[in-house]
From Swiss-Prot:
Known role: Succinyl-CoA synthetase functions in the citric acid cycle (TCA), coupling the hydrolysis of succinyl-CoA to the synthesis of ATP and thus represents the only step of substrate-level phosphorylation in the TCA. The alpha subunit of the enzyme binds the substrates coenzyme A and phosphate, while succinate binding and nucleotide specificity is provided by the beta subunit.
UniProt-listed NCBIfam families: PRK05678.1, sucCoAalpha
Catalytic activity, EC: 6.2.1.5
InterPro entries, alphabetized: Cit_synth/succinyl-CoA_lig_AS, Citrt_syn/SCS-alpha_CS, CoA-bd, CoA_lig_alpha, NAD(P)-bd_dom_sf, SUCC_ACL_C, Succinyl-CoA_synth-like
Superkingdom in the source lineage: Eukaryota
Molecular functions (GO terms): nucleotide binding; succinate-CoA ligase (ADP-forming) activity; succinate-CoA ligase (GDP-forming) activity
HAMAP family in the record: Succ_CoA_alpha
Protein name: Succinate--CoA ligase [ADP-forming] subunit alpha, mitochondrial
Family named by the database record: Belongs to the succinate/malate CoA ligase alpha subunit family.
Binding site for substrate: 194
Length: 331
């Protein structure tokens, strides 16, 4: 009788302990402030497509960088482990078990839109889709679903991802070129993002957060979404914007910069100055059509908003450094 009483007491104690732990976790989660620009060291990430070649490689890289990777999703492989992380059959299961609030998607193009929708239905705060070549018809449906909700933010698709140097890397960017610092970078081009990162690191300014928004016509996060965050972020003292031909995203960014009256210096580069009309230049969205979306139009709009537009990507870092110097912003 005494033994069974002791056992009951232990079970009750264990249950109470679990309850207190859960309450403590919930309180900590509630107390944690939202990241200034989408991610920080508290971001808990799962990988959709974790057991595939790309998912495996980039999850290893993220773990090595220090990102809080908490699990992965591969249908029919739930209950297994991969890279020391639990694998689940669905995003909803993964979120319930790991308290993840972000996902990165390395899923082949025919299935990527469904993966995005699944992450949205699980109401993750952030979904980063790296996949290139998703059918535009699929992305129209995703965009419509995104616009009907306010819980989930999508970055991408067809993008390098997002990184807060030294804290959280979600995507395919090389971590070692980044340095925690003062410049926020937002770009439609992956490789030009790396160029801007390398240069701002080389001149000693570093980066606050870098966001690759992707080069597809239908993406989840645009220049203005990122600029709003950078303008309000105290760590971001300068902004680099890298655009390209096609669409009106850069003109919208110029209008926002003008309206915001921000005093933070903005340096921009627009790719595709010599692109012939009607020809797609690398990205699905990089096309001048109907006489609209030219580099000249974008450069003009940005300069009228007070942005310093450089003619060559090689000048991004040195130009930002000179502006910091002129304004007495260098320590």
């Amino acid at each position: 009788m005494a033994a069974s009483a002791r056992r009951a007491s232990q079970l009750l104690g264990s249950a109470a302990s679990r309850l207190l732990h859960a309450r403590g976790f919930a309180a900590a989660a509630a107390a944690a402030p939202s990241p200034a620009v989408f991610v920080d060291k508290s971001t808990r990430v799962i990988c959709q497509g974790i057991t595939g070649k790309n998912g495996t490689f980039h999850t290893e890289q993220a773990i090595e960088y220090g990102t809080t990777m908490v699990g992965g999703v591969t249908p029919k492989k739930g209950g297994t482990e991969h890279l020391g992380l639990p694998v689940f059959n669905s995003v909803a299961e993964a979120k319930a078990e790991t308290k993840a609030n972000a996902s990165v998607i390395y899923v082949p193009p025919p299935f990527a839109a469904a993966a995005i929708m699944e992450a949205m239905e699980a109401e993750l705060d952030l979904v980063v889709c790296i996949t290139e070549g998703i059918p535009q018809h699929d992305m129209v449906k995703v965009k419509a679903a995104l616009n009907k909700q306010s819980k989930t933010r999508l970055i991408g698709p067809n993008c390098p991802g997002i990184i807060k140097p030294g804290e959280c890397k979600i995507g395919i960017m090389p971590g070692y070129i980044h340095k925690p610092g003062r410049v926020g970078i937002v770009s439609r081009s992956g490789t030009l993002t790396y160029e801007a990162v390398f240069q701002t690191t080389a001149v000693g300014l570093g980066q606050s957060t870098c966001v690759g928004i992707g080069g597809d016509p239908f993406n989840g996060t645009n220049f203005v979404d990122c600029l709003e965050k950078f303008v309000d972020d105290p760590q971001t003292e300068g902004i680099v914007l890298i655009g390209e031909i096609g669409g009106t995203a850069e003109e919208d960014a110029a209008a926002f910069i003008q309206e915001s009256k921000t005093q933070k210096p903005v340096v921009a580069f627009i790719a595709g100055l010599t692109a012939p009309p009607g020809r797609r230049m690398g990205h699905a969205g990089a096309i001048v059509s109907g006489g609209k979306g030219t580099a000249q139009d974008k450069i003009k709009a940005l300069r009228e908003a007070g942005v310093t537009v450089v003619e060559s990507p090689a000048k991004i870092g040195s130009t930002m450094f000179e502006i910091f110097k002129q304004r007495g912003m260098l320590e």
